[in-house]
Amino acid sequence: SLIVGLTLSPASFAEEKKEEKKKEEPKPQSVFKDKALEEGVRKFVFAKRYNKEPLVEADLIHLSTIKVTNAGIKDLSGLEKCRALASLDLAGNEISDFNAIKDLKRIQYLNLAKNKIEDVSPIAGLTALQYIELSNNRVKDLKPLEKLSNMRSLYLSNNRIIDFSPALKLTKL
């Protein structure tokens, strides 16, 4: 009877271990879909600068500056998690849609020069903006910028703008 008990114990122990393995947490997924953006942002996340662990929301909440230029970035999803962002430089990429930053109210400096941007409406509510570089894009309409009352520097050369009158409402330029 004692021998039988010992024989059963290892088997039941092995079953318990199998159950434990099934309950393991799923591996964290990066908040970024665009690998070039993730690699660029990684340089600004001190704890993960030299490893390949996925960047998760907790890594990004205190980031104030991101600069990733000429990296072939297309998709900005994930940047919406960077709530403390004050300076964003993504010049020289392949960006056409930058809706991901539309709620980042602390941004003061934004460089999106040399991209494929046509619609600037995502920045209409970013009232802390003081500097915008949008040269060498495909921007046509400046109306979304007219309420950015803190704007001090606005660069728009080499775009498709017909009407500059919304920029005239920016009194600090």
What is the predicted function of each stretch?
Residues 2-89, 94, 99-100, 105-109, ...:
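N-terminal capping/linker segments that flank leucine-rich repeat
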Residues 111, 133-136, 155-158:
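Consensus positions within tandem repeat domains that build extended binding/scaffold surfaces
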